[in-house]
């Protein structure tokens, strides 16, 4: 098993990379199956030792590695399932689903759901609306499976129903005043749930753990090697990814049975190297990047990514390829990372410096890097040692 992990909205182990942060101490699911011990070596299920658990939730892969019991990990999976039942906007019967189908009427919800909606609205306000929980109608237009950009008219019509100010939450109710508008907590829920998983493990006496919920990474204590976790931040290499996507789509288009393997062999893919490796203990690492989901519009040849600007209804056009937020809570990292990309490097650096307990690593589309924010976090994670990175003060 590797000694390195990565982050991006990542996997787990001592070292990780990011569209999510991830850890090199974490094996792939297939390698984990190959490494299963024989029945005579299996420890007692309640014995505290390093254990790993992969599971699917929130429409993404989740991973936990911890010095814990099997029961501890069972509790983690159960907790995530509970939050999915509450917060999913696509699962019939969830609180968010009920709010979106209430046709403008105030809806009774779990107090925790209402509290998270209020917290999400706080980040909407703090970011001047660059983080917006009412983007669902717009996001549906940018169908990454159809690989076709929506018309200007469709975007304009969807924008009429976008605006976080249409949402209100009390202690146990939520209302969206525009019946055509919808909310989704996808931009903050995984961070919030990662924090709750952290709290659960702490309550169960777990001190050392790596938590990755679809790339929202939280690390606790030390890795199995007795030192802080290493988290690798993915290098966006935006232009190479654009070319790769173009070649892949051309290969798919000319093959009657799917991907033309011969064309893909010509891509010359190299083993991915992280843009940097952070040293982390008791910290959250959340990365948003324009390389996470994108498609080539066959009609125009343009590449569109998934980070939408609520002001224009289109993929943002800032100079940033990724933003990695280092913070004490994953809720904060999730709530800030996407907005920072839309802001662009200069504005994002100024914004993160205003936050008291967070720092950020910015990678621009041309590959240059900058760091800004809480100096103690930057020094603790060795982010200030990133080769060539500008330290914005």
PLM-predicted stretches and their roles:
Residues 1-393:
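Mature catalytic core of soluble alpha/beta enzymes
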